[in-house]
């Protein structure tokens, strides 16, 4: 749909948003589905990419027994009425194609920290069923979490391992907020290659 219209998901999410400034959230105010309590925004602050989508699930959309792990307190936690968990970030190139998936500590995302097993349980609850700011973009973001679920599960587990390792090596710093540990796991992706793997797996099951 977007290719036929000579556009892409990045252009769509930035459409009508004015100048593109580093660290600002696009669209302004983020995208939030009040029924599923899914949330995302697009911004930029890393070299080697145009920008990236950060995806979240807010507390009301989580399994009822999910609780944050023991962690340092931060001012941003006191300014919200609920909690939220970062799920995965999707890095985009200048042509508007996804090139990486990555996880972070709290320095950029200002979320509450949930254990990997709980974050993995949240993945299937993420769904953006909205027309604003772009229905195709909302479908695309939701579909990316479905298509790359195995890789996201792996990255979330590596995230916990990376933070635990950082805390051992740097006991005097807050690993949840340390800029030296801001990217906790990362991997390159290809939509075309992933679809081929899915097709091959389905063919194997069918035979």
Predicted regions and their residues:
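Amphipathic alpha-helical interaction segments
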Residues: 58-66, 110, 115, 121-122, ...
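Short linear sequence elements within intrinsically disordered, low-complexity coil regions
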Residues: 45, 58-61, 119, 131, ...
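Alpha-helix initiation/capping motif
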Residues: 56-59, 93, 115-116, 129-133
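Long, compositionally biased interface segments
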Residues: 133-207
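N-terminal domain-onset segments
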Residues: 1-32
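Aromatic- and glycine-enriched beta-alpha-beta binding-site module
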Residues: 25-99
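Generic preference for hydrophobic/aromatic residues in regular secondary structure cores
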Residues: 38-42, 98-102, 145, 190-193, ...
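Domain-level detector of nuclease and nuclease-like folds
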Residues: 81, 99-129
């Amino acid at each position: 749909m977007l290719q036929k219209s000579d556009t892409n998901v990045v252009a769509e999410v930035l459409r009508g948003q004015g100048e593109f400034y580093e660290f600002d959230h696009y669209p302004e105010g983020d995208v939030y589905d009040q029924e599923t309590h899914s949330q995302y925004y697009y911004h930029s602050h890393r070299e080697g990419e145009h920008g990236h989508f950060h995806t979240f699930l807010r507390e009301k959309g989580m399994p009822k027994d999910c609780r944050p792990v023991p962690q340092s307190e931060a001012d941003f936690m006191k300014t919200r009425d609920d909690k939220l968990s970062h799920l995965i970030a999707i890095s985009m190139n200048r042509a508007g194609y996804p090139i990486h998936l990555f996880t972070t500590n709290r320095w950029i995302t200002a979320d509450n920290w949930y254990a990997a097993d709980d974050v993995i349980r949240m993945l299937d609850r993420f769904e953006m069923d909205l027309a604003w700011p772009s229905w195709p973009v909302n479908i695309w973001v939701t579909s990316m979490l479905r298509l790359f679920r195995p890789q996201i599960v792996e990255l979330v587990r590596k995230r916990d391992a990376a933070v635990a390792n950082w805390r051992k090596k740097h006991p005097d710093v807050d690993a949840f907020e340390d800029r030296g540990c801001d990217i906790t796991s990362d991997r390159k992706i290809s939509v075309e290659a992933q679809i081929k793997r899915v097709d091959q797996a389905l063919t194997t099951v069918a035979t």
